[in-house]
Swiss-Prot record:
GO terms for biological process: cell division; regulation of division septum assembly. This is Cell division topological specificity factor. Belongs to the MinE family. It comes from Hahella chejuensis (strain KCTC 2396). It holds the Pfam family MinE. Keywords: Cell cycle, Cell division. Prevents the cell division inhibition by proteins MinC and MinD at internal division sites while permitting inhibition at polar sites. This ensures cell division at the proper site by restricting the formation of a division septum at the midpoint of the long axis of the cell.
Length: 82
């Protein structure tokens, strides 16, 4: 192995890592793009209603919409204090 081959192989490994990271970012952006525009507002309103009865943070509620062929499921995960 020559001196130049050592540095060249490192660039290939770096390129593959960068490509993998970019694929993850693109997949995340695509999944966010499919969510409806009203989802952040819905999450805020749910937080306000629950906040009337229990003190929770915005980070304690997660709203997600899963779509299948002909069905959409709204999933709420709320971490309530003990």
């Amino acid at each position: 192995m020559s001196f130049w081959d050592y540095f060249r192989s490192n660039k290939q490994a770096t390129a593959s890592v960068a490509k993998e990271r970019l694929q993850i970012i693109v997949a995340h952006e695509r999944s966010q793009r499919n969510q409806p525009d009203y989802l952040p507002q819905l999450q805020q309103e749910i937080l306000e209603v629950i906040g009337k009865y229990v003190k929770i943070n915005r980070e304690d509620i997660q709203v997600q919409i899963d779509r299948n062929d002909d069905c959409a499921v709204l999933e709420l995960n709320i971490t309530l204090p003990e």
